Amino acid sequence: MSADENNLIWIDLEMTGLDPERDRIIEIATLVTDANLNILAEGPTIAVHQSDAQLALMDDWNVRTHTGSGLVERVKASTQGDREAELATIEFLKQWIPAGKSPICGNSIGQDRRFLFKYMPELEAYFHYRYLDVSTLKELARRWKPEILDGFKKQGTHQAMDDIRESVAELAFYRENFIKL
């Protein structure tokens, strides 16, 4: 392993909802790729403990999705709160990339960053201010070359590490099939 400033940090959060003023992070996962999207390492996937009262605020979609995946039970059983999950993630990242070098990478990553800013500010500050958001390419493809979207299908498990792996694969798909290099 080597800390390389060209490596990319990919992150995904599962939350109890979409409003960081009301909802909370219930799962965090990270992985690191090189600049060519080769996966170098998978970080910890952490179920972040939240109270029963917080979990009771979830809407039907979140209850169904996160109960069906087993995440709700993992969250209830977890002993790691926001701070412990944040520190474990930072310790992993320090092995692979210096602070402030990687953009935050993922799908619709602005939403995740809002939650990081509120609940894991030290981790949020570890990223460069830029974003590498795969959903930007998806939206451009939808408008400019919609037929390309049939070539990549996501599983949509809404489990953080699975979602990150799909984001990396999706960006690689767009690199090969949409972007002229």
UniProtKB/Swiss-Prot annotation:
UniProt entry keywords in alphabetical sequence: Cytoplasm, Exonuclease, Hydrolase, Nuclease
Alphabetized SMART domains for the sequence: EXOIII
Compartments in which it is found: Cytoplasm
Enzyme class, spelled out: hydrolase
Molecular functions per Gene Ontology: 3'-5'-RNA exonuclease activity; nucleic acid binding
Protein family per UniProt: Belongs to the oligoribonuclease family.
Protein name: Oligoribonuclease
Annotated source species: Enterobacter sp. (strain 638)
